[in-house]
Amino acid sequence: MNKIAFFLPIVACAAALILGFDYHYWWAYALIAAAAEGILYLMFYLNNSSIEYLSGHIVRLEHHYPWTERCEKSRTVGGKTERYVSYVDHEDEYIYELNTGHTGSIPEKEYERLVRLWPTYKSEIHVQHRHCVSGGGGEEIKWNGDESITETKTYTHRYRNPLKNSYSVNRGQKIKKDEAKALGLFDYPEPVADAEQQVVLVDPDVYYNGNIDETNRELQRLNAFCGAEKQIHVFILLFPSNEGSQIAFKQRDYWKGCNKNELVVCLGVNDKQVDWCETLSWMDNDALNNEVKDYFRQNYNKNLTEFVKWLRAHLDNWKRVEVKTMKTSSQMSLGSTLYLWISASLISAFVLLCAYWIGGK
């Protein structure tokens, strides 16, 4: 039923011809309808997509040498247009590449630090720059495989989320930001530029007699070294144990069912002791969820860093659900359905108005 909404701009274009608009401009009507379809699809995609977090580790570094670019420009002087040439100097650029293929800029100090740590040799590379008149070139160095001497990074990726605006059990109730704050729920931690994402989140009322920074770093490494292969991103959330395990499901609702690659381990902590554990994910198979709960039943007072090491060795039972196999995408919520039809109607009205302006009689 909702798919019909995407045909409304085409119907508006056909209506323009039926109403007697100049048919010689049929190509203009078609272009307007095509542009309208693109805008409608983009709006629908953004409304039904989510941002997930992906992690990786640096496997290659590049240093691009300074270079000078020749630019041809035009300007108007005394009513006449004349062309002139200017030169732009570009400084050194330092680039990292992750095992996932993602690339980005890296500060010079971090580049130099990693180069000193890596026992491999630099090699010259040819760097292509448009309109380069001097300088250029560069060098690269590759990681040798030692986990202890590389860095991890986390970045965002947008994907179609069939749970976001559907009548899915996993989606849960809608919780607003102020309500979440009152309940003591966590916001998604954003990756920090040139640093990493905090993946162990601790409620201010929790007293945990352990090294959170150490656990956080160990979990960042799990996400970076196992994330691409296992399609997983793990968070650990520490709540006061007296909140009860129901707070974990409110957290799931606030995070809109979580993301497809996430395993969220929620723990009720009282000093050194873990009183309860709940896991949140899209998995159909509960094997790993049950293993995690069993771990904390038997190791309720163990250091969380040891748990992360244990989890890394037990990821064989993790399998991310494929979005294409989910059957919720056609079961849109009432709000999303109204949003789609109102948007399609307004865009179609705009198509008809443009057609009238071009070929109306």
Predicted regions and their residues:
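A structural boundary signal for the start of the first folded domain, especially the loop/turn
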Residues: 2-250, 254-260, 282-361
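Catalytic nucleophile-His microenvironment captured as a short glycine-rich beta-strand/loop
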Residues: 252-255, 261-278
